[in-house]
Amino acid sequence: MATHTFSCIDGHTCGNPVRLVSGGGPRLEGANMLEKRAHFLKEFDWIRTGLMFEPRGHDMMSGSILYPPTRPDCDVAVLFIETSGCLPMCGHGTIGTITMGIENGLITPREPGKLSIDAPAGKVDITYRQEGRFVEEVRLTNVPSFLYAEGLAAEVEGLGEIVVDVAYGGNFYAIVEPQKNFRDMADHTAGELVGWSPKLRAALNAKYEFVHPEHPEIRGLSHIQWTGKPTQPEAHARNAVFYGEKAIDRSPCGTGTSARIAQLAAKGKLKVGDEFVHESIIGSLFKGRVEAAAKVADRDAIIPSIAGWARMTGINTIFIDDRDPFAHGFVVR
């Protein structure tokens, strides 16, 4: 029997939690972060569930673990952990990790104001604005993002037929726009969205296959993005992103915003240089932009960037005690 100790810095990005594991992360094998992610999931997923699930975490918890980069053009490597698994990429997690990492001396960029992270989804370039010891804004240039499929239909109990577009922005997202059985996220409670989302996700995954054309290790639809009209005057759209089993992202969701920008660009509604301000379910904002056109295999894609802010809320020392019957956490469904 042993007690495993993890040093953590807690914070949030535009309202959504980030738990940065600053000490206690396991040594991982692999030539790149995708391979290290696979090793973590095989041997150490109990760390993720122990730190993210109750009683040490909660339904919305997400976090990250820092590692030395596996490639010479990056300053630091990041493994993203959350209630739904180890994401290839996490936008709000990146903003929070960079903010708290720099403010607490865990990350030292080679060039002030900019750095690159080595994520399982690939290299992510970042700029940040620092005033004194505080990082006030982080902008990440995300991985190539693209519209994967249009007009996919699935039946959802209690809602009826729902038609979605699926786009990739670091994870696969089903984007639910206004239609016969869903007019606007504002017409529904968060509880209703949480109830419908896993049914819609399961139906889509059962009916269709979602595989990244260049990275077959990245597969499966993981997130549902419900959309609506903005309530903030500077925003172009509002969204509520469902992930895990019961979570609605409190931030506008970085990879979700990337996927949304890719979808709109593919439909001719955004072009290179255009900005897209995305509002979350609680009114916080991410500032997105189409940075460049790109290709992913034979698919047209874009390079999106996302800007947002984060704040540190505390420092934790967390124990996972092998004697604890809930050492690896639990989820109440």
Swiss-Prot record:
InterPro entries: Pro_racemase_fam
Keyword Isomerase in annotation: yes
Catalysed reaction, written as an equation: trans-4-hydroxy-L-proline = cis-4-hydroxy-D-proline
GO MF entries: 4-hydroxyproline epimerase activity; trans-L-3-hydroxyproline dehydratase activity
Keyword presence, Isomerase: yes
Residues given in the record as substrate binding sites: 91-92, 223, 249, 254-255
Keywords, comma-separated and alphabetical: Isomerase, Plasmid
Induction: Is slightly up-regulated when the bacterium is grown on t4LHyp or t3LHyp as sole carbon source.
Major enzyme class: isomerase
Enzyme active site: 90 (proton acceptor), 253 (proton donor)
EC number(s) recorded for this UniProt protein: 5.1.1.8
Annotated family: Belongs to the proline racemase family.
Protein task: Likely catalyzes the epimerization of trans-4-hydroxy-L-proline (t4LHyp) to cis-4-hydroxy-D-proline (c4DHyp). May be involved in the degradation pathway that converts t4LHyp to alpha-ketoglutarate, which would allow R.meliloti to grow on t4LHyp as a sole carbon source.
Protein name, entry field: Probable 4-hydroxyproline 2-epimerase
Organism: Rhizobium meliloti (strain 1021)
